[in-house]
């Protein structure tokens, strides 16, 4: 397995991973992923298996500061409106692995290594923020295992097939040390 920057030729596979990982009402669009890649190429990484097939992706943006409102977290938002090349806050906008790779510890390893890679090209980053659904216990386990702390809850943020009115979004943050 190797981590490398995503390219436009990966988009079809990234969309397959998106469809595999999320229910339809949460899946983000091809256009959104293309904009993320254009806004911050060093912050959009893929996990490639030994055959060269993309099996996971990690997309992120640099923000100036922690937002004081919840609107900036909206799904399918335009990263070009919020990304700041000199931002110190890394927002992980999306992260997913193909289902066949889940449950083996690869998610945590991939996520941690992506943070390290992004930090190499954006050395000013001092905090990482993300939003996760209350329904995604495995994802929360990864983030908590990497010392992310919940700082805010957004009621009904994520569409849900299980929870009427939607699942709460949990905003989590981690302050970075020299070594992630």
What do the PLM-derived regions correspond to, one by one?
Residues 97, 103-118, 141, 145:
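Conserved acetyl-CoA-binding loop-helix of GNAT-fold acetyltransferases
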Residues 23-50, 54-65, 77-81:
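Active-site rim helix/loop that mediates acceptor-substrate recognition in acyltransferases
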Residues 99-102, 128-140, 156-167:
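Conserved beta-strand-loop-alpha-helix junction that forms the acyl-donor binding cleft
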Residues 1-14:
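A short beta-loop-alpha structural element at the N-terminal edge
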Residues 42-46, 57, 94, 129, ...:
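Short hydrophobic/aromatic beta-strand element in the GNAT-like acyltransferase core
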Residues 90, 111, 118-134:
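Conserved GNAT acetyl-CoA-binding A-motif
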Residues 143-153:
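Conserved acetyl-CoA-binding loop of GNAT-fold acetyltransferases
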Residues 59-94, 156-166:
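Conserved acyl-donor/pantetheine-binding loop and adjacent beta-alpha core of acyl/acetyltransferases
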